[in-house]
């Protein structure tokens, strides 16, 4: 069962979460993933890529193989660990490689669909 299926079946009977406590093993907040310029720019790129992917999927112009391949790359890019390495609060000493790997996944979404690479 997928989360969407579950919500269709039980969504009306679920309680509303009024407050979501931010937590991680690192700090009890979202600061390591959002807020700094580099982090926010990466989220913007991810968001735009997801929008473009969803539009491509709905268009019916792409094969199942193209959509599935692009979706795999999309899911890999949506892993929260990418955002750990952005900003000044974390330093791997090789942040450039994490940035390139993240952006390569986003590029592969477009390339899997036969679209032009974005300019990032």
Language model: regions and residue ranges:
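Active-site and substrate-binding clefts of carbohydrate-active enzymes
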Residues: 1-120
């Amino acid at each position: 069962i997928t989360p969407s299926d579950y919500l269709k079946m039980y969504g009306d009977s679920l309680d509303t979460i009024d407050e979501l406590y931010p937590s991680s093993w690192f700090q009890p907040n979202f600061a390591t993933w959002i807020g700094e310029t580099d982090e926010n720019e990466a989220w913007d790129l991810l968001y735009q890529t997801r929008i473009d992917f969803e539009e491509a999927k709905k268009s019916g112009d792409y094969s199942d193989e193209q959509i599935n391949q692009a979706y795999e790359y999309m899911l890999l890019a949506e892993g929260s660990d990418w955002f750990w390495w952005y900003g000044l609060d974390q330093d791997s000493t090789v942040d450039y490689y994490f940035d390139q790997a993240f952006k390569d996944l986003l590029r592969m979404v477009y390339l899997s669909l036969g679209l032009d690479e974005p300019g990032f």
